[in-house]
Amino acid sequence: MTTALDQLKQYTTVVADTGDFQQLAQYKPQDATTNPSLILKAVQKDAYRPILEKTVRDHAGESVGFIIDRLLIAFGTEILKLIPGRVSTEVDARLSFDTQRSIDKGREIIKLYEAAGVGRERVLIKLASTWEGIRAAEVLQREGIRCNMTLLFSLVQAAACAEAGAQLISPFVGRIYDWYKKQKGADWDEAQDGGANDPGVQSVRRIYTYYKHFGYRTEVMGASFRTTSQITELAGCDLLTISPELLQKLHDSTEAVARKLSPDEARDARLERVAIDESSFRFQLNDDAMATEKLAEGIRLFSADAVKLEKMIEALR
């Protein structure tokens, strides 16, 4: 029997969402994504501790920020040895509201990859989908530096990223699901509120439809999954980035997977363009309590994990 994972690959490019690159080979993903939390999780494992220790040792006397950048590139280059496609490396979340410093950091990361023999076409720079992050992506894209816009929870963020010419967006599914499930509390009914009705699934479907309807070339990569149902409900999305745990579940399943998203259906939808000047962007984002709260929370969590990683490095110096 064909596995659910192999069926999914017929409709969607499968991406591995992990810093634990030793798990990549068995799932044969096209691309891979990382973030500060995943790198922090990886370097706490015995298998990856030597990479951290070597990076600190090789750059003794340099700043902690300098060492972290080299650590991200060390993980990225190892990941690229195991996949045919691209790796996403994230700009420090503490720069989420600083356009110029985000631009500078994106350029620096690409230079480090190129110095390691990796072409920029194999790297995506991850930026938070704040107004400032989107403006940074607009500049970097014009320079041939491709960007992956993360912490994306709303259509207005997606529309702004597309207008800025971002290579790819990562609309989150699981974190939207978490928010609505918490809001409903005891009234949440998984059978009724999950599956095709899952608010996170519906958000990505809405964004995908908007992009294909208006002919945007920005790729849509669903992210942040809690269940395999959320994944299979988005079969047909351009890409889906999936944790090793859920990749394993899909690999072990022979449940039928049908295409759920289609560019042809999206083109026939009746939609209006979203206004995306700065004031409209900020108002629409502010008007969406879920997106506002999850964006702020995501930046806080990634920033906190960056601080934890800095402390680990300090302890080794």
UniProtKB/Swiss-Prot annotation:
GO terms for biological process: carbohydrate metabolic process; pentose-phosphate shunt, non-oxidative branch. CDD domains: Transaldolase_TalAB (cd00957). Its EC number is 2.2.1.2. The active site is at K126. It comes from the Bacteria. Signal peptide: none annotated. Keywords: Cytoplasm, Pentose shunt, Schiff base, Transferase. It holds the Pfam family TAL_FSA. Its main location: cytoplasm. Homodimer. HAMAP family: Transaldolase_1. Transaldolase is important for the balance of metabolites in the pentose-phosphate pathway. This is Transaldolase.
